[in-house]
Amino acid sequence: MKRYAIYGAGSLGTVLGAYITKSGEKIDLINRNKAHIEALKKNGAKITGAVEMTVPVTALTPDEMSGKYDVILLLTKQLLNAEVVSFLKDFLAEDGVIVTLQNGLPEPGIAEIVGSHRTMGCVVEWGAALVSPGVCELTSKADSLSFHMGKMEGISDAKFAEVKALLERMCPVHEETNLIGARWSKLLINATFSGLGTVVGGVFGDVSESKAARKVAIRCMKECIDVGHAAGAEFAPVQGKNITALFYYKTAFKRALATMLIPIAMKKHRSIEPSMLQDLKKGKPCEIDAINGIVCHFGKACGVKTPINDRIVEIVKKCESGALTPCAENIKLFDDLL
């Protein structure tokens, strides 16, 4: 019998695990958060928001793991990858794979530890939030859920089909031949709306529906596109939309037009609370270096200036240290860059 696990079953992983379990497939939900795991064991996974359901699930802490898994869906913070992936390597079946559903560009680092033939990447195009132990909110509209999945060299067609079928128990899975392009497209969305959402202390809609924030957002998008292109990436469509055609500009007129499109494009995802903001609220370090920070990193390497992303990193790090608090007033900290 095949064995499946979600490692780092927080908000996204609990929602995904509930869908997969409800469909009749067995999967272990694993998290270091003992209160969350105990609540899942006692009450099942309660999902609110775009859907309402409570599903009995199999939940474990890492010290309760045993045996080998054929597929491990990885949803921990990328900050911990070296430690986590090295730990998971011992629980991976000989032909098993780690499928990273994380933000940023995580595949190369994982492949260094377990091999490219055991590494797959998946872009998550929906959001969720942990409300309380055992309770998660699906914050994207139910008709806008999807995955974009690609594979690295050495993954068999059979293994790819197996993972695809597993994830399709929740929502459509698009086979992505341009995984790097899909990663950069998701990075653009995260850098803009998770980055700025964290700065202003709000959900994606607080960025997309604010005139002041949109002025910053469109410039953040352009920086991401410029850097991605300089790094050799061809941006993949996001849920059928060509984001470079929609949001890239070279003239003030196109910039104004693209800015107007932001709230329309983000309408179905307006309620997503940035995972970085969720981390700050819990007093945890966030993934700013793996999101906006990676844009800045590639910008420097490719000779592309990234003043908006640099400022987002600076502000979020100040929020981490307590020197600043995420709030709407923080958008004024970009005025000198506009």
Predicted feature locations:
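Rossmann-like NAD(P)(H) cofactor-binding subdomain of soluble oxidoreductases
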Residues: E52-E137
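NAD(P)-dependent Rossmann-like dehydrogenase/reductase catalytic/cofactor-binding core
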Residues: K2, I218-L338
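Short, charged/polar "capping" segments at the starts of alpha-helices
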Residues: A35-A39, E107-G109, D157-A158
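Internal alpha-helical scaffold of NAD(P)-dependent oxidoreductase catalytic cores
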Residues: F91, I113-R118, V135-K241
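Nucleotide donor/acceptor-binding cores
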Residues: K2-R3, D70, L145
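NAD(P)+-binding Rossmann beta1-loop-alpha1 motif at the extreme N-terminus of oxidoreductases
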Residues: M1-E52
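Active-site-adjacent beta-strand anchor residues
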Residues: I6, I30, L74, T100-L101, ...
